[in-house]
Amino acid sequence: MNEKKVVIIVSSPFYLNDYDRFGINNFLEKGFKIDICNVGPIIYPDFYKNAEKKNRYEGSLQKVFYKKKELKDYLLINKKNLFLLNIHYNYSTHFIFRIISNLNIDYLFSIINIVPSNIEIKKYISLKNYLNFKTILRV
């Protein structure tokens, strides 16, 4: 794959101010392709469905994923690009980090201004205690 692409993965609705905050126009002006991958419907379906609709970015750069298989297929096809993950690591997002790790995808990780999450939910505490973060991600 010869094109330069930055793939931004978000877990909440992507608004017009997010478009500016991420500097999407700057990337485009420098010749980068941009994909905004929204995994909100998979990770936080109720939050995504009920979130404010006003000022959402609805442009062609955004791909909204409703199924894990769609996301996995997308990641496989685009694994040579640079990924910016703007999602928490928790029980709901574990599968994304696992796929990224297995595909040896290069990525940056940011947790600035993302949807808060509580990884201390009782039924998931055992998973949290079982997992060793260093073995999941190869840094």
What are these regions (language model features)?
Residues 7-30, 37-139:
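Active-site and donor-binding regions of nucleotide-sugar-utilizing enzymes
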Residues 3:
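Phosphate-coordination loops involved in phosphoryl transfer and adenosine-cofactor binding
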